[in-house]
Design a protein with these regions (language model features):
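Basic nucleic-acid-binding alpha-helical/helix-turn surface characteristic of O6-alkylguanine DNA
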Residues: 59
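PLP-dependent class I/II
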Residues: 2-4, 8-14, 19, 25-34, ...
Length: 399
């Protein structure tokens, strides 16, 4: 029988989605599941975007330019200017989601065996994209006990080898909700400059910063303009995960030319998705403010509530809509599966993402989960109550 490729064998399962079959069977048994496992916003997509789809008049669903519609890229220039990110339409490449932007960035800049430093815990699909590019992730370990802040620059510098080609950050961070400080961003800049590395910066959650701290984009950092590749997406900002529209932005012409080869090979980004995304830029600040205010309330409610459960601890996330939570359990992956297979409270249970899947270092995150506060407050209240009941009943509890 023909063999599966080594690349395919090495490809990890998603820690966010691999429990889905267990959830499906629980739902078949009539169990109501509170989904805190995945960053799927429940807030309405802008009406203007939905209207653009409803009023779509074309008679042919044609290919779009491989770089994306020029009209959309021009409007993005104005959008980014509000964040003091100064770019041109030529600097922007529209992708099929932020995920494709990361994949194409890796494929365009990393050779097989090259190393990329990424702060852990990190968005699990980064590992899949690195494997696809033949690259090796070297984790910069951060811990829940220190609030997921970066280690000292000397510790980070020890990880750099002759094979190191890039550093990647997600700011604000998925899965931790951590927001890098000016000092930390300068620390990263100095390493990028000293060793002439690429800096990949996933800034999908820039609109969700809750501390009053300034948003510092990688494109704000002086002296590394040719090293920075910025990743963006409409998925979270406008609750448009399903239209699969992202962007790769860089001042580095050689990188853009190489990325465009991959863009041409996949032909074009989604037609209807670009129409909706372009229309969303007209939704105005009121829409983003309402979304922001809702997440502020959910964040406060969830963190206050779960930190009242005995043995449970979550730092206060500064951005995005996730938090990593420490639980009094022997193994969070077993606990998450048990919640779906062997537990229910008043015919309800909870689905979470085991945090071990967001770490590269073995043993890290073994008693942690990632929660996404993407449910209404009433549902969050029920979910927290169910979690507390589950922890009381779980055979592997540690308190």
């Amino acid at each position: 029988m023909p063999q599966i490729s080594q690349r395919g064998t090495n490809m990890p399962q998603s820690p966010i989605r691999k429990l889905a079959p267990l959830a499906a069977r629980a739902a078949e048994r009539g169990i109501h599941i509170y989904h805190l496992n995945i960053g799927q916003p429940d807030l309405p997509t802008p009406t203007i975007a939905l209207d653009a789809i409803r009023n779509f008049k074309r008679t042919v669903l044609e290919y779009t330019p491989s770089q994306g519609f020029l009209s959309y890229r021009r409007k993005l220039v104005d959008f980014y200017a509000h964040y003091n990110i100064h770019t041109t339409p030529e600097d922007i490449i529209i992708t099929s989601g932020g995920s494709e932007a990361v994949l194409f960035a890796f494929m365009s800049t990393l050779n097989p065996g090259d190393e990329i430093l990424i702060t852990e815990p990190f968005y699990a699909n980064y590992l899949a994209f690195a494997i696809s590019a033949g690259a090796v992730i070297k984790p910069i370990t951060t811990t829940i006990n220190e609030g997921f802040c970066l280690p000292k620059v000397e510790e980070m510098e020890k990880l750099i080898t002759p094979r190191t080609r890039a550093i990647m950050i997600c700011n604000p961070n998925n899965p931790t909700g951590y927001l890098y400080t000016r000092r930390e961003m300068n620390q990263i800049r100095d390493l990028v400059k000293k060793y002439d590395l690429y800096l990949f910066s996933d800034e999908v959650y820039r609109d969700f910063i809750y501390t009053g701290s300034p948003y510092i984009s990688a494109m704000h950092l002086e002296g590394i303009e040719q090293n920075v590749v910025l990743i963006d997406s409409v998925s979270k900002r406008y609750s448009e995960c399903g239209i699969r529209i992202g962007a790769l932005i860089t001042k580095n012409e050689q990188v853009r030319q190489t990325v465009m080869k991959f863009c041409q090979a996949r032909l074009s980004p989604p037609l209807v998705g670009q129409i909706a995304a372009e229309a969303s830029l007209q939704s105005g600040e009121d829409y983003l403010r309402d979304v922001y205010d809702e997440y502020v309330e959910r964040r406060k409610f969830l963190i206050d509530s779960i930190n009242r459960i005995p043995g449970v601890y979550s730092p206060i996330p500064m951005g995005a809509f996730y938090t990593v939570v420490q639980l009094p359990v022997d193994d969070s992956e077993k606990f998450c599966a048990w919640c779906l297979t062997d537990f229910s409270y008043e015919n309800q249970t909870i689905m979470m993402a085991p945090a071990s899947g967001f770490y590269m270092t073995p043993g890290m995150g073994h008693n942690e989960v990632r929660l996404a506060y993407v449910l209404k407050k009433d549902d969050l209240a029920q979910a927290v109550n169910v979690l507390a009941r589950a922890l009381e009943a779980y055979p592997g509890k540690t308190i």
